[in-house]
């Protein structure tokens, strides 16, 4: 019989501690060197979501919230929810508990963001600001009075994603209100949790549930422009460490009571990564904004002047979800590969984008964005990756093709090395290029594709109708044949043919005559 050595419990605990330490070290090393997590980004094909496809989830005269969802959550990433939050001047978005990682960009207006994660924090936000809030934070948002320079309304776009690998409840949205958090529990639980008389809980429960967005005067009656609500309320709901009966944490209580000021990143006050007469780009990652550390989301902004193009490029590590802030343009995305799949779902695509539209491009899909000759194109992009993403360009000074062997590249394109030298050396610009009438050419091709699709759809419709008619006729013929067979079975056994009946009738008189003649003879 084989003997098994039984390790002492202390040894097992030491082994387990070692494994956990190694895992943590690898995790920290991955974060330090920005090692990407291999997985898909929640969607596998280019997407275009038009402005009228935003789904409103809340709307009053004080503001509104609309949402769209990108992807299906494959590979443990996504789905990504994009929210558009708009507040009228002097209004408040009441406290919310975040269920997901939140990265946002301020499109217009100004206000104050207050939140609690481990501490109570606050920051002023305005047009062009980028910031991030972690899951589990409790936050609320206040809009300032009308500002003729920044805009009359506070509007921001936010992306929500789940970075953790823990189980995710599909019933959970991006956030929940403090009211739902409070009164989802019974009175007895709340009374014991807060240590207050039953009457207080009953009084609060019987109050009318307020909407998510309210006028500031409803929160602070008789007081104008009160920009700091009591942080203790947020600390209470967030489960702040100050509420824990711990001596060491009590010593830091006075420090915790202070609302710390946080710093945002403003795209309009920072030096662009690239700028030319044809446009500018700026990318914000964890190196630019410390709160992005640990997030799977980065932010970029592209401004194309009239008749310009973001040169053909692809993202080696990130998917890109972009929102058009201003103007209109065309987007071209390639989906071709060496496979023989020629279905319409795998063809290259082009589409027109306008203010308020969202377009999403998966990782490694070559793309180009173009502005029209009479309009600029400005869009903010959310990139989804655990690694810093450096776009690779097809042409220009930063062309990835320049790194390849010229003879090998010439053989790939079936041209001479001299031709390759001329091809790669002609373009002196980079990243954003002049492209006069490129967008106009793309939209004309798009119109042709739409007309061709209409013709193909009509041809397919007629073919389907004809096939349906043939199948219907075949079915009716089959039913008729079955009815005839059933009627034939009902007549069984078969009747004698009429000719035999007539013959028998003729034979009967003759038989009678023969019988009579026989009787007479006898």
Swiss-Prot record:
Keyword Translocase found: no
This protein's UniProt keywords: Coiled coil, Glycoprotein, Signal
Biased composition (Basic and acidic residues): 466-491, 501-515
Pfam families: Cupin_1
Signal peptide: 1-25
InterPro entries noted in UniProt: Cupin_1 (IPR006045), RmlC-like_jellyroll (IPR014710), RmlC_Cupin_sf (IPR011051), Seed_Storage-Functional (IPR050253)
Source organism, top-level taxon: Eukaryota
Chain positions covered by the region annotation Disordered: 457-522
Domain Cupin type-1: 265-421
Glycosylation sites: 206, 303, 341, 374, 414
Family indicated by similarity: Belongs to the 7S seed storage protein family.
General function of this protein: Seed storage protein.
This protein's name: Vicilin-like seed storage protein At4g36700
Annotated source species: Arabidopsis thaliana
């Amino acid at each position: 019989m084989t003997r098994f050595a039984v390790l002492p419990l202390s040894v097992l605990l030491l082994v387990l501690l070692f494994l956990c330490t190694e895992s943590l070290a690898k995790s920290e090393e991955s974060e330090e060197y920005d090692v990407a997590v291999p997985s898909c980004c929640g969607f596998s094909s280019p997407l275009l979501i038009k402005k009228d496809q935003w789904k409103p989830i809340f709307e009053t005269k004080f503001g509104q919230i609309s949402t769209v969802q990108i992807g299906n959550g494959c590979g443990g990433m996504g789905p990504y929810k994009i929210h558009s939050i708009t507040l009228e001047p002097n209004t408040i978005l009441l406290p919310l508990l975040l269920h997901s990682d939140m990265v946002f960009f301020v499109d217009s207006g100004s206000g104050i963001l207050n939140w609690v994660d481990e501490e109570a924090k606050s920051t002023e936000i305005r047009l062009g600001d980028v910031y991030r809030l972690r899951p589990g934070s409790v936050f609320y948002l206040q809009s300032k009075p009308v500002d003729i320079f920044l805009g009359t309304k506070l509007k921001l776009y936010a992306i929500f994603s789940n970075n953790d690998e823990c189980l995710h409840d599909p019933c959970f949205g991006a956030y929940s209100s403090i009211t739902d958090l409070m009164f989802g529990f019974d009175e007895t639980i709340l009374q014991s949790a807060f240590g207050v008389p039953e009457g207080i809980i009953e009084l609060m429960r019987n109050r009318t549930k307020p909407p998510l967005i309210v006028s500031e005067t409803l929160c602070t009656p008789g007081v104008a422009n009160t920009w700091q609500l009591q942080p203790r309320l947020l600390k209470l709901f967030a489960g702040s460490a100050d509420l824990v009966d711990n001596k060491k944490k009590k010593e830091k209580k006075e420090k915790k009571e202070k609302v710390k000021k946080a710093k945002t990143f403003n795209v309009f006050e920072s030096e662009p990564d690239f700028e030319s007469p044809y446009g500018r780009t700026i990318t914000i990652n964890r190196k630019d904004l410390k709160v992005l550390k640990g997030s799977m989301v980065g932010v970029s902004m592209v401004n194309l002047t009239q008749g310009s193009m973001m040169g053909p490029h692809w993202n080696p590590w990130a998917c890109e979800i972009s929102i058009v802030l201003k103007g209109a343009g065309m987007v071209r995305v390639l989906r071709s590969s060496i496979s023989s799949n020629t279905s319409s779902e795998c063809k290259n695509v082009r589409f027109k984008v306008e203010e308020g539209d969202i377009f999403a491009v998966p990782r490694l899909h070559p793309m180009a964005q173009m502005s029209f000759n009479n309009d600029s194109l400005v869009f903010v992009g959310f990139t989804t990756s655990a690694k810093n993403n450096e776009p690779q360009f097809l042409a220009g000074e930063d062309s990835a093709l320049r790194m390849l062997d010229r003879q090998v590249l010439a053989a790939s394109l079936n041209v001479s090395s001299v031709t390759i030298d001329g091809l790669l050396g002609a373009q002196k610009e980079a990243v954003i290029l002049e492209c006069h009438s490129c967008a106009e050419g793309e939209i004309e091709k798009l119109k042709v594709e739409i007309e061709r699709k209409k013709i193909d759809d009509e041809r397919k419709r007629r073919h389907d109708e004809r096939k349906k008619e043939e199948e219907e006729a075949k079915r009716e013929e089959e039913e008729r044949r079955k009815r005839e067979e059933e009627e034939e079975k009902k007549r069984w056994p078969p009747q004698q043919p009429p000719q035999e009946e007539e013959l028998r009738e003729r034979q009967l008189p003759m038989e009678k005559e023969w019988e009579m003649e026989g009787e007479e003879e006898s």
